[in-house]
Curated annotation (Swiss-Prot):
Protein name: Large ribosomal subunit protein uL3
HAMAP family reported in the protein's UniProt record: Ribosomal_uL3_B (MF_01325_B)
Keywords, alphabetical: Ribonucleoprotein, Ribosomal protein, RNA-binding, rRNA-binding
Pfam families: Ribosomal_L3
GO BP annotations, alphabetical order: translation
GO molecular function terms noted in the UniProt entry: rRNA binding; structural constituent of ribosome
GO (cellular component) term, any one: cytosolic large ribosomal subunit
Gene coding for it: rplC
Annotated spans, Disordered: 122-151
Function: One of the primary rRNA binding proteins, it binds directly near the 3'-end of the 23S rRNA, where it nucleates assembly of the 50S subunit.
Quaternary assembly: Part of the 50S ribosomal subunit. Forms a cluster with proteins L14 and L19.
Superkingdom, taxonomy of origin: Bacteria
Region forming the signal peptide: none
InterPro entries given in the database record: Ribosomal_uL3, Ribosomal_uL3_bac/org-type, Ribosomal_uL3_CS, Transl_B-barrel_sf
Length: 209
């Protein structure tokens, strides 16, 4: 069954394995999540649990939000996300979900929003090769051919300049190196999408070997 938790990206560091290998890790701070709602097939057409993460001030919450979290007897949450494919019997409304659900060595999928890069050209955005930089060349960093003349239009999907980054990215099959229950930290091998302090979702891997 799937299990997951919401957290924040703190940054990257390094740890040593028992055999002396140096492992780059990303530190995820996952304070206890609260189960706000259980979606059922009878009422909602599908099964899922709704997790809330990171308290926010009541002043910034509207009445529907306050009423929703009151059922779980908790404070309004800044981030609310659903998790499907879980064991519904293992969760109750108001229950806290902590980092202890994971253990070192588990394989997980990590989802976040990539860093925004603004408006970028075809070389940076799509990895295209540039043209000759020598004297006389009139083609340096432009997108190149727009396609055949006959259609009288540019086909959809042509790699062109535009906004880069700020997309939801999922990196699959990352290993949990360490779980620090006292400080609510997950140390995940390698890098994960997004800038520091961005919202991160850690879930059981769907393609783990």
């Amino acid at each position: 069954m799937t299990k997951g938790i919401l957290g924040r990206k703190i940054g990257m560091t390094q740890v040593f394995a028992e055999n002396g290998d140096l492992i780059p890790v990303t530190v995820i701070e996952a304070a206890p999540n609260v189960v706000l709602q259980k979606k059922t097939a009878e009422n909602d057409g599908y099964e899922a649990i709704q997790l809330g993460f990171d308290d926010k001030r009541e002043k910034l919450s509207n009445k529907p939000e306050k009423g929703h979290v009151a059922k779980a007897e908790t404070a309004p949450k800044r981030f609310v996300k659903e998790l499907r494919g879980v064991d519904m019997d293992a969760y109750e409304i108001g229950q806290e979900v902590k980092v202890e659900i994971f253990s070192a060595g588990e394989i997980v999928d990590v989802t976040g929003v990539s860093k925004g890069k603004g408006f970028q050209g075809a070389i940076k955005r799509h990895g295209q090769s540039r043209g000759p930089m020598s004297h006389g060349s009139r083609y340096h960093r432009r997108p190149g051919s727009m396609g055949p003349v006959d259609p009288n239009r540019v086909f959809k999907g042509k790699l062109l300049p535009g906004r880069m980054g700020g997309d939801q990215i999922t990196v699959q099959n990352l290993e949990i190196v360490k779980v620090d229950a006292e400080r609510n930290l997950l140390l995940i091998k390698g890098n994960v999408p997004g800038a520091r302090k961005t919202l991160i979702t850690v879930k059981s891997a769907v393609k783990s070997k």
